[in-house]
């Protein structure tokens, strides 16, 4: 008897795990990006003529949103959820969001965890090594505003005091779905403001 990949055998009867549903927009219940005017126009134009005419900035923006390279700056327990988003269940690389080890090859830095006063200069140094345009995702309550350690003498009350933050992902720790939603919001922000303005 062969088992389905989503089935697990326990004591004779198979149990079916829930399939991954993707990231749903809480307002509409539809997958994120299903109502994105940018992609709807491109799909309509491609299906109509087989090609489309666009400005160079639109083409660069489209390429940039599909090939964001991120660098981890995992400082505490949020880094576990950041690792989980790269695993097969969520597979963030299907959105063109691939990890890189060097800040010189990265477009996005994910600050995940408690930022201490001693670590703040290192964070700024790594941020300065990233090429322009560069983006920062602040992940978790500690990175957003100090979190549980807000009143500690050794904690920076938010990484936005050290580097400019583009997307805040709330939670303690935030789920992998929340981080994935933050990545999709960053892509939407890049499409909205373009790269020349940045």
Curated annotation (Swiss-Prot):
It comes from Afipia carboxidovorans (strain ATCC 49405 / DSM 1227 / KCTC 32145 / OM5) (Oligotropha carboxidovorans). Belongs to the complex I 20 kDa subunit family. It is an enzyme of class 7 (translocase). Keywords: 4Fe-4S, Cell inner membrane, Cell membrane, Iron, Iron-sulfur, Membrane, Metal-binding, NAD, Quinone, Translocase, Transport, Ubiquinone. This is NADH-quinone oxidoreductase subunit B. Residues 1-20 have a biased composition (Polar residues). It comes from the Bacteria. Its EC number is 7.1.1.-. It catalyses: a quinone + NADH + 5 H(+)(in) = a quinol + NAD(+) + 4 H(+)(out). GO terms for molecular function: 4 iron, 4 sulfur cluster binding; iron ion binding; NADH dehydrogenase (ubiquinone) activity; NADH:ubiquinone reductase (non-electrogenic) activity; quinone binding. Residues 1-29 are annotated as: Disordered. It is found in: Cell inner membrane. Its cofactor is [4Fe-4S] cluster. GO terms for cellular component: plasma membrane; respiratory chain complex I. The gene is nuoB.
